[in-house]
Amino acid sequence: MQIVETTNEGLKRAYTVTIPAADIAARVEGEIKKIAPQVRMPGFRPGKVPANLVRKMHGPALHQEALQTTIREAMDKLVADNKLRPAMQPAVSLGEGYDEGKDAELTVELEVLPQIEAPSLDGLKLEKLVVPVTEAEVDEAVARIGQGQKSFTDAKKGAKAKDGDQIIIDFLGKVDGVAFEGGAAEDTPLELGAGRFIPGFEEQLVGVKVGDEKTITVTFPEDYPAENLKGKEATFDITVKAVKNAGEFEANDEFAKMLGLESLEQLKTLLRGQLEQETAGLTRTQMKRALLDQLAAGHDFAVPPSMVEAEFEQIWAQLQQEAQREENPEEALKEIEAEKDDYRKIAERRVRLGLLLSEIGQANGVQVTSQEMEMLIRQAAQQYREQDRQRFVDYVRSEPLAAAQLRAPLYEDKVVDFLFDKAEVTEREVTREELQAAIEAEEGAAAEAKPAKKAPAKKKAAKEEAPAEEAAAEEKPKKAAPKKKAAAADEAPAAEEAPAAKKKAPAKKKAEG
């Protein structure tokens, strides 16, 4: 086999590889000898079919298989002999006019990973913004649960409904005098002042009594999900069947026992733990972004364009999906299109950070254990139907690239934790609002990719936390979804989705989307 380098520019490499016809033919002959004992043909005893007949029957298929195997081996040799670290799968093309009996002339094009030295971790300093959980916040959390457990009892006869009361109603909605689908319901509980129905609905029912029949007029919002009701004026015929007063909520041991706990103190302890876990997640997000900003500021090496393009395509696809869910998809698409160059630079930053974190992890022995990997696979399999889970597990175990993409986020977190341990960390107590503002500021600064302009405040900033793969030479960057600047934690979804519209009762505000 002959290998000739034809391009060596920056991170681009190209080669011509010549595989002698004799090598391919020898592999074909070897395969014929392997399968001959299993070939059956009328007129011949089992295993006694002549090689020339086996070749005639199976030759083309065996040649194609031998050619593909030889090409794979040639690629392995090319990578090993030249100590290459491909950024992505090399592009391999077989010369035109190739036929059996001829030498195979291959053209190979690829991009390699840059040579990166793991940076010194001396002098790495980080500030940890800590939000203490106050007793008032715990009490508020208890009160919120109490609101959800609110009980109602019948009001005195003839009592008029007021804000905070619950009324039981039948209603029939009409547009232009005609009832519309989903606009009628019976025995519907409605808490006045809760804001669960469309604007103007609840307000007109303050003061009603049991037995009252009333017709109210409302206007559906312009962003109402049902196209036939958007902006339309409608009337609702209301029959009041009950008026109920809310019971007084009291935070005590009895209330905690209603929730299956032993005491109010136990409830508060659980809620405090939840609040502390939530703020700890925000603190980690702030520290991680500050860390990545420091790393990005100190490194500006070239990265493979193919990796940047793959990362950008993932970001772009997610942004387009988000835009389609906006109130005005066309306007949202125009907005992201105007900022396309910014997002491409964000993709470049993410790839660069991913390679850098990978190098740091490998240089310092950071690993994802087999037990951790097994847990990852099992957790990921849960998103599939039960009958498909084992197939997914088998696929990940047999496909190195699939396993690498699954492992990458955990590996990145382990590298980040390693850097946290190495850094000189100073703590400062702040309020939740101050912590959130710090996250927003870091996210906005990260989105400013030189020499691009700073991203607008309402721009959806792509996630800056780049991948950090365990074997960068063999793995693509993690394809993490972009997210809005308003997202609080780097583990958060790309966009908070509004609840789906309820078809049952269009009058409810929840159905507004």
UniProtKB/Swiss-Prot annotation:
Keywords: Cell cycle, Cell division, Chaperone, Cytoplasm, Isomerase, Rotamase. Its EC number is 5.2.1.8. Pfam families: FKBP_C, Trigger_C, Trigger_N. InterPro entries: PPIase_dom_sf, PPIase_FKBP_dom, Trig_fac, Trigger_fac_C, Trigger_fac_C_sf, Trigger_fac_ribosome-bd_bac, Trigger_fac_ribosome-bd_sf, Trigger_fact/SurA_dom_sf. GO terms for biological process: 'de novo' cotranslational protein folding; cell division; chaperone-mediated protein folding; protein transport; protein unfolding. It is an enzyme of class 5 (isomerase). It catalyses: [protein]-peptidylproline (omega=180) = [protein]-peptidylproline (omega=0). It is found in: Cytoplasm. GO terms for cellular component: cytoplasm. Residues 436-513 are annotated as: Disordered. Residues 164-249 form the PPIase FKBP-type domain. Residues 452-461, 501-513 have a biased composition (Basic residues). PROSITE patterns: FKBP_PPIASE (PS50059). Residues 489-498 have a biased composition (Low complexity). GO terms for molecular function: peptidyl-prolyl cis-trans isomerase activity; protein folding chaperone; ribosome binding. Involved in protein export. Acts as a chaperone by maintaining the newly synthesized protein in an open conformation. Functions as a peptidyl-prolyl cis-trans isomerase. Consists of 3 domains; the N-terminus binds the ribosome, the middle domain has PPIase activity, while the C-terminus has intrinsic chaperone activity on its own. Belongs to the FKBP-type PPIase family. Tig subfamily. This is Trigger factor. It comes from Novosphingobium aromaticivorans (strain ATCC 700278 / DSM 12444 / CCUG 56034 / CIP 105152 / NBRC 16084 / F199). The lineage of its organism: Bacteria, Pseudomonadati, Pseudomonadota, Alphaproteobacteria, Sphingomonadales.
